[in-house]
Amino acid sequence: MSDLARILVSIVAILTTVDLAAADQSQEDLLRQRMAFWEAHAPHCKAGDFDSPTKATTDPNQPCDDGDMTMFNGLLCYAGDERGCQAVIDAQDPESGQWFRSPRIRLLGHNDRGDASFSPDMALGVQLYLVKKGDTERAMKWATWLNGLVYKDFAPWGVNWFNKLTDHNIAWFCLEQYGCVVRPGDAASLGLTFDYLHDKKGMPVLPDGSIRGTAASWVKWEATFMWLSSNNRPGYSQHLHAVDILLRRLINGDDNAYMQEAKDLAGKKENEGNAFFAWLAGKSRAEVIDQTLKRCQAPDVLPKPPLFQWQWERDNHVDPGQLLAYQQSCYWDCIFMAKLLKVQSP
């Protein structure tokens, strides 16, 4: 190759690098601008003195679709959004220690959105908050409340089988229905969370009882439950697996823990375009930003009410006559991604 040819090749390489850098910067700027747009349009649930992130209904008399918000607010808290942290705090009764699905539902005293007042999914959001903030006081109040729940003997035989294995009555997150049960995988996560708060943050030992016995019995099997969760069904079940990976990384202090499990999630065809899964799997910043911008709203492409979707918990399947999840995004899922990417609105 002649000297002139080498010079030309070098110039082309430099120009290409500059163009790519400019493109990346352009995407960064666009994400920052979109962040301001999402912030301006994201719905809030106002109840009593509380003003917290929510999904939305189209009912002006009850505009808050907040039945799952304690989990989503825990995710926002993890990503550094203090509004999410405060919403998780406000969803707990400060006297009893009981946690609810949202601050509004706590004030109401029951879940008018259907189902029980709490669930294993919400417990993941609570644990993200507890570990992120090292809040041993609220953790102890919650554990004490859980431990004091009267055992409900209305569960199927499987729970009674768990009881025999642990020599403890299985614990419950609430008492309204069978879905409140602390399953073995939930117990393993609780065991990891309470062990972390005890070992690293000085939380007292849990009182003897169902929650301590259940958590201690199953925490040793946490790797097995993580493997089982990797086979979860598409949609929200796989999203729960992703949230569990996030929690365990936070506890371990290792952003690369369970990386293969995260890559497996992101690589599934039904999850193509899921920016949260891509971020969790360690995809490049440019790729994650690109996926976020493709599915998060722009001023000229507005979502269609009701804004009731946290799109990262949905796969790409859509039933006839229905919209894709990102087309009905609540905006907070997009704010969550921007916060994960440490982007601030201008």
Give the role of each language-model region:
Residues 174-193, 210, 214, 226-232, ...:
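Eukaryote-biased recognition of C-terminal alpha-helical segments
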Residues 24-48, 136, 235-346:
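Terminal, non-catalytic domain-edge segments
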Residues 27, 32-63, 92-112, 148-165, ...:
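Glycine- and aromatic-rich loop/turn segments at beta-sheet edges
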Residues 1-8:
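Bacterial N-terminal signal peptides that target proteins for export
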